[in-house]
Curated annotation (Swiss-Prot):
GO MF annotations, alphabetized: serine-type endopeptidase inhibitor activity
Keyword Lipid metabolism appears in the UniProt entry: no
Protein name stated in the entry: Double-headed protease inhibitor, submandibular gland
UniProt keyword annotations, A-Z: Disulfide bond, Protease inhibitor, Repeat, Secreted, Serine protease inhibitor
Any one Gene Ontology cellular component term annotated for this protein: extracellular region
Principal cellular location given in the protein's record: secreted
One matching Pfam family: Kazal_1
Further comment found in the protein's record: Three very similar inhibitors found in the submandibular glands are secreted into the saliva. The sequence shown is one of the two main inhibitors.
Repeat as UniProt keyword: yes
Start and end residues of each Kazal-like domain: 6-66, 67-115
Superkingdom as given in the UniProt entry: Eukaryota
Disulfide cysteine pairs (residue numbers): 12-46, 24-43, 32-64, 68-97, 75-94, 83-115
Source organism: Canis lupus familiaris
Localization per Swiss-Prot or TrEMBL: Secreted
């Protein structure tokens, strides 16, 4: 079967307004999603992951250690290894983020440096 889901589910029912629009307070309580993106608060997380093609869960109650918001599909060759939860070494943030994206949020950062 599928691997056990990582992270914790966020109950977004509290934030649903009329229709599909969610109005969020300007609260700064960052959380990190399993897509390795930092959301400014839980409400924004709900608003922005509502229409994702896969379920995003909450990885941690802080900003992400490795931010996967801006990275390219073509990665450079620089070597700053990151260890993925799949036990693989990724040569740098870019290749790690691409793997996270492909895995639909099932791979997360195990540690900085080689596994």
């Amino acid at each position: 079967g599928p691997p056990p889901a990582i992270g914790r589910e966020v109950d977004c029912s509290n934030y649903k307004g009329k229709g599909s629009q969610i109005a969020c307070p300007r609260l700064h309580q960052p959380i990190c999603g399993t897509d390795h993106k930092t959301y400014s608060n839980e409400c924004m997380f709900c608003a922005l992951t509502l229409n994702k093609k896969f379920e995003v869960r909450k990885l941690q109650d802080t900003a992400c250690d490795i931010e996967c918001t801006e990275y390219s599909d073509m990665c450079t060759m620089d070597y700053r290894p990151l260890c993925g939860s799949d036990g693989k070494n990724y040569s740098n943030k870019c290749s790690f983020c691409n793997a996270v994206k492909k895995s639909r949020g099932t791979i997360f950062l195990a540690k900085h440096g080689e596994c």
